[in-house]
UniProtKB/Swiss-Prot annotation:
Subunit structure: Component of the MBF complex.
Keywords, in A-Z order: Cytoplasm, Nucleus, Repressor, Transcription, Transcription regulation
Name of a matching Pfam family: Whi5
Keyword hit for Transport: no
Function as written in the Swiss-Prot or TrEMBL entry: Negative regulatory component of the MBF complex involved in cell-cycle-dependent transcription.
Full protein name: Transcription factor NRM1
Record family assignment: Belongs to the WHI5/NRM1 family.
Record localization: Cytoplasm; Nucleus
Gene symbol of the encoding locus: NRM1
Primary location recorded for the protein, binned into one broad class: cytoplasm
GO cellular component: cytoplasm; nucleus
Amino acid sequence: METGRLPLKDLSNFQVNKLSILNTRNNIHLLKNSKHVHTTLPSIKSLISPTPVDPYTKQLTPTTPSVFLNNIQQADDKNVVSGGSFTAFKRASEGQLSKKLQIRLQFAYYKYITNQIDSKFKDIKKKHKNSVGGIRYSQYKSKEQKRTVKRRKLLVSNGSYKNPAKFTPTNDRSFPPINNNPIAFQKFHSSIGSPVRLSTASVINDSCTDKSSEAHSHSINNAFNETTLLTTPSSKSYKEKEVLINNKIQTTPMSVKAAKSLISLFTSNRQ
């Protein structure tokens, strides 16, 4: 069954609305003489003592016992006779209910004074935790504590790993002072540490003593011209090329033709 909405007359007969009239000495005679009594809660200001509340203290200042609680305790000591539609009873729940009501009203009045109506209890509690002895803790902080420690950032390169640079082949095939010189070609590979160092030295020595040195020197020049496509960057000046040789950067041929010509040169059977 659906319960309909109670009228205001029935809602006004609840226990909470009767506490202010039922538990006062001055209003006991109203219960016997009159049937219609205004059952309203007392004002908030009457429940709370006029002692000011310090908003910066960690705990709220204790309030003196209000008139409302004193009247409840006095009414509990005496047995009040029921009159009309009201019933007087003595229960422990009445004191607990009135105490909860008082705390809620005190908190509502405190939020109204401090202009914190929209704020919740947790937010107000955090503000009081940050205060020490009525003065905010931030005033006692030293300058060293207020300094923000900057986080050290890891400096990482863009690629995170240094990859060998890819260079496009250039038309500049002159590499001084090695151009068209087999002895300089030997020095170039020996300074850089090429794996073909030993084979080139033996071939060059044999080609210088042999009568058919012209054919071998011609093949060496062709092979050297093919090996100019190196991984080393094509520098604009001669000094930069010389620095690359002194740093002993390992160079390898980029073209397949140069590799094939070197293999055929070193593996060919000379007559």
